[in-house]
């Protein structure tokens, strides 16, 4: 049984809810944040195994959060998958350059995401 914790960071409740349900069915433990401030606090407090991160968030971008995480020793090795509506090739390259381990565009298939995790 997989009990790894996944932090879902998205400002849209419906996306977080859909991801949480799909991941819990695959035996992941999920925690959620709707902005980068909440996300950073959960990362520090809960130490999730992986981060699913939207690009466009209130209070700052997912890229800003990822850049901060990759600079800090405590969090630099945390795997990050960007989940975003930004589909342009330049956006994909920018997300990967900042430190994303994978980049998935919305809409996406939950089963494919779980396979990538």
Please identify what each model-predicted range represents.
Residues 16, 58, 76, 88, ...:
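The feature encodes the CheY-like receiver
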Residues 17-25:
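Charged docking surfaces used in two-component/phosphorelay signaling
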Residues 108-117:
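C-terminal output helix
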Residues 46-52, 57:
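Active-site beta3 strand of CheY-like receiver
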Residues 27-36, 42:
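Short hydrophobic/Thr-rich beta-strand motif most characteristic of the beta2 strand and flanking loop
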